Curated annotation (Swiss-Prot):
<dbReference type="InterPro" id="IPR006151">
    <property type="entry name" value="Shikm_DH/Glu-tRNA_Rdtase"/>
</dbReference>
<protein>
    <recommendedName>
        <fullName>Glutamyl-tRNA reductase</fullName>
        <ecNumber>1.2.1.70</ecNumber>
    </recommendedName>
</protein>
<dbReference type="GO" id="GO:0008883">
    <property type="term" value="F:glutamyl-tRNA reductase activity"/>
</dbReference>
<comment type="similarity">
    <text>Belongs to the glutamyl-tRNA reductase family.</text>
</comment>
<dbReference type="InterPro" id="IPR015895">
    <property type="entry name" value="4pyrrol_synth_GluRdtase_N"/>
</dbReference>
<feature type="binding site">
    <location>
        <position position="121"/>
    </location>
    <ligand>
        <name>substrate</name>
    </ligand>
</feature>
<dbReference type="GO" id="GO:0019353">
    <property type="term" value="P:protoporphyrinogen IX biosynthetic process from glutamate"/>
</dbReference>
<dbReference type="Pfam" id="PF05201">
    <property type="entry name" value="GlutR_N"/>
</dbReference>
<dbReference type="InterPro" id="IPR000343">
    <property type="entry name" value="4pyrrol_synth_GluRdtase"/>
</dbReference>
<feature type="binding site">
    <location>
        <begin position="190"/>
        <end position="195"/>
    </location>
    <ligand>
        <name>NADP(+)</name>
    </ligand>
</feature>
<keyword id="KW-0627">Porphyrin biosynthesis</keyword>
<comment type="subunit">
    <text>Homodimer.</text>
</comment>
<dbReference type="GO" id="GO:0050661">
    <property type="term" value="F:NADP binding"/>
</dbReference>
<keyword id="KW-0560">Oxidoreductase</keyword>
<dbReference type="Pfam" id="PF01488">
    <property type="entry name" value="Shikimate_DH"/>
</dbReference>
<dbReference type="InterPro" id="IPR036343">
    <property type="entry name" value="GluRdtase_N_sf"/>
</dbReference>
<keyword id="KW-0521">NADP</keyword>
Length: 429
């Protein structure tokens, strides 16, 4: 059984395609259970799913045939052809899959180099797989080692130093459009972690006003209270949109919530004063046609990439250090995996040896109990038990010593001496 990572990310797939595969956290466990049912002809497969704004990945411990099926299942889930998904996806096996997982956890594969949020998202993915009952010992080991590597990378390097977050990038872009951010009104749509971070950055600029719209009013009020923002109902957005100079949106909606018509009406009421809009959602919150409007400056999560990547060149030394830590982690994991390989692996052999010796032990114990029940002397019974175990353990070895040609017997003799006469050799020393 091999370890696999397959999926799409910001480097391989455009925003709209990624949007088809953006699954909310509470959707992941049910989808993994559905995947397991579709893999019923491949028993023992382990799976986990990571879904963020910038990537959707499935990690598997499985054979090749199960991976081919999984890619088709994922394509069907997103409503696209397998050929289209394959053209924009990657499928990585064993050491490449482990390296990818370690790089993702460490923030090296993120749009924002060194960002820490992905580590928490990976831990959420593990919990979802556990809830679905599809994680398994192999993937659990992969993820636990991913977390350990990520911790070492962050504590031993400066990979996250001086990075620019998406939220900070949004503020920087707004500053290029508006001369004074303290003279604008800002609307946030959504109440998740990304909106909270954006609100923190914009609030630091002391704008004229902050407002927040959310589908769940209570949750919106809780976040708004932290920044002194007013709260709007999501249904009121079309009629209130013109009041705001900047709109930052990031919800989990499967469909756009700010349409072209609403923005056109807002611009008319604003007498075509410019509007700054940032859509951090995947799939989109704001209809893409809005970008064509002359007085709107609309940025998506992909548009912010060039801003957040500023300064990454100066952190290449930290990247090199991180890659060295990851290299060591990959080697360690692959050694662990090889030991558990059914063909030639140490762990399966140890299990077989333990099972065989347990059969011998049980057989000799049963024989000893019968002898004791017949009134045999305990010393004689113990001697027979020990002799019986010794004969069973050495029978195969003795047969191998007599088999084969002279060279083979000599090699076998060296191995047997190393295994069975080690204690005697140490005693002689």
């Amino acid at each position: 059984m091999a370890v696999w990572a397959l999926g799409i990310n910001h480097s391989t797939a455009p925003l709209d395609l990624r949007g088809r595969f953006a699954f909310a956290l509470d959707q992941i466990a049910p989808r993994l259970q559905g995947l397991r049912q579709s893999l019923s002809s491949h028993p023992g497969v382990e799976t986990a799913m990571l879904s963020t704004c910038n990537r959707t990945e499935i990690y598997c411990a499985a054979e090749q045939a199960a991976i081919d099926h999984t890619l088709g299942w994922l394509a069907h889930s997103g409503g696209v052809s397998t050929a289209l998904l394959r053209a924009h996806s990657y499928t990585l096996q064993d050491s490449r899959a482990a390296r990818h997982a370690f790089r993702v956890a460490s923030g090296l594969d993120s749009m924002v180099l060194g960002e820490a949020q992905i580590l928490g998202q990976m831990k959420d993915a593990v919990r979802a797989a556990e809830t679905a009952g599809v994680l398994g010992s192999t993937l659990n080991q992969l993820f636990q080692r991913s977390f350990a590597v990520a911790k070492e990378v962050r504590s031993s390097t400066e990979i996250g130093a001086h990075s620019i977050s998406m939220a900070a990038a949004a503020v920087r872009l707004a500053g290029q459009l508006f001369e004074d951010l303290s003279q604008i009104r800002v609307l946030f749509v959504g109440a998740g972690a990304m909106i909270a971070l954006c609100a923190t950055h914009f609030a630091a600029k002391n704008p004229l006003g902050l407002a927040l719209a959310n589908r769940t009013l209570e949750r919106g009020e809780q976040l708004a209270a932290r920044f002194g923002a007013t709260v709007l109902r999501l249904a009121d957005l079309p009629e209130r949109l013109h009041e705001f100079d900047a709109v930052i949106s990031c919800t989990a909606s499967s469909l756009p919530i700010i349409g072209l018509g609403a923005v056109e009406r807002a611009l008319k009421k604003r007498r075509h004063r410019p509007m700054f809009m940032v859509d951090l959602a995947v799939p989109r919150d704001i209809e893409p046609e809005v970008k064509a409007l002359g007085d709107v400056y609309l940025y998506t999560v992909d548009d912010l990439a060039s801003v957040v990547q500023t300064g990454q060149a100066s952190r290449q030394a930290a990247v090199a250090q991180a890659e060295a830590i990851i290299d060591a982690g990959v080697q360690s994991f692959m050694h662990w995996l090889a030991q558990r390989n059914p063909v030639g692996g140490v762990v399966p052999l140890i299990r077989q040896l333990n099972a065989q010796t347990e059969v011998w032990r049980a057989s000799e114990i049963a024989r000893a109990k019968k002898l004791l029940a017949k009134g045999e002397a305990p010393d004689a019974v113990l001697d027979a038990l020990a002799r019986g175990l010794t004969q069973k353990m050495l029978h195969g070895t003795m047969a191998e010593l007599r088999a084969g040609d002279a060279d083979m017997r000599a090699q076998t003799a060296q191995t047997v001496a190393r295994l069975f006469l080690r204690a005697q050799s140490n005693h002689d020393l």
